[in-house]
């Protein structure tokens, strides 16, 4: 499928100068017209409204990914051990499944919902040394099922093609993007193939998303940029950033 390369209309600008230690997990809320994001290592959740208002909440452990709920108030968030529901208005926190209680050295990292509303989250070795990370699919009741087996030092993503039949995940330490066959009806993950590999000068592929034209946008940890790729993996554009780790 051919897509038109994106036009970059303006340079990146700072919307919240909070000097995060490890800022991640951007989630745009159409309902609130605001961006949710987290500082993983400082255990903080932020909301930056388009109108300029800035709010923050603190937790007792890492918080790494955010998704807005469709069937209830507040958010689904990944804490160190698993998924939880959090209502910013009341600060009520309800813990759901924690699938890696036996892996004391792991934590959850990136995550998001697919088009059917299932939440996906990946784990990683907190020390960034051992290949103990895996990917989990959470059902509507918050129960976790391991969808991709351990073997990952740092997981990031996922994101999907517009037709929902391919899921992309980032093998961050090994600098590669892996594409999996995907069944959107059941959430089943199929055969994997290397989709894109980066060199040392590119940094490490971190968070990513798919735009309305089907292009993948990939943040580069240590690469000071965000790159855009068409569905065949060819680079369409690059946006530089004032920070080395994006």
Where are the regions a protein language model picked out?
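A short beta-strand motif characteristic of beta-propeller blades
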Residues: 11-17, 52-58, 94-101, 143-149, ...
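Beta-rich, blade/repeat-based domains predominating
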Residues: 17-32, 60-75, 102-118, 149-166, ...
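Conserved beta-strand positions in repeat-built beta-propeller and related beta-rich domains
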Residues: 29-30, 35-40, 76-81, 119-129, ...
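A short loop-to-beta-strand structural motif that recurs across blades of beta-propeller domains
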Residues: 44-46, 82-84, 133-136, 176-178, ...
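Flexible "stalk/tail and boundary" regions
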Residues: 71-73, 88, 136-143, 162, ...
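Hydrophobic alpha-helical segments and helix pairs
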Residues: 91-148
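Loop/turn-rich, solvent-exposed surfaces of beta-rich toroidal or solenoidal domains
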Residues: 176, 197-233, 244
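Short loop/turn segments immediately following beta-strands, especially the blade-tip
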Residues: 180-187, 231-236
């Amino acid at each position: 499928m051919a897509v038109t390369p994106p036009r970059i209309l303006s340079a990146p600008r700072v919307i919240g100068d909070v000097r995060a230690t490890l800022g991640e997990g951007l989630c745009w809320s159409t309902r609130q017209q605001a961006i949710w994001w987290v500082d993983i290592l400082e255990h903080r959740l932020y909301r930056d409204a388009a109108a300029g208002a800035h709010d923050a909440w603190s937790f007792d452990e890492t918080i790494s990914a955010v998704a807005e709920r469709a069937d209830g108030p507040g958010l689904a968030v990944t804490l160190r051990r698993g998924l939880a529901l959090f209502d910013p208005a009341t600060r009520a926190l309800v813990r759901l499944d924690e699938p890696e209680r036996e892996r004391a050295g792991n934590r959850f990292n990136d995550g998001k919902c697919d088009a059917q509303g299932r939440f996906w989250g990946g784990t990683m070795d907190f020390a960034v040394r051992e290949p103990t990370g895996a990917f989990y699919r959470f059902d509507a009741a918050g129960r976790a099922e391991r969808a991709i087996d351990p073997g990952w030092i740092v997981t990031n993503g996922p994101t999907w093609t517009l037709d929902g039949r391919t899921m992309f995940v980032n093998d961050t330490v090994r600098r590669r993007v892996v594409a999996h066959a995907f069944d959107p009806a059941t959430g089943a993950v199929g055969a994997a193939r290397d989709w894109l590999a980066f060199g040392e000068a590119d940094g490490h592929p971190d968070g990513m998303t798919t735009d309305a034209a089907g292009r993948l946008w990939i943040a580069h940890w240590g690469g000071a940029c965000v790159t855009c790729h068409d569905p065949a993996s060819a680079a369409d554009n690059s946006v530089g950033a004032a920070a080395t780790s994006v």
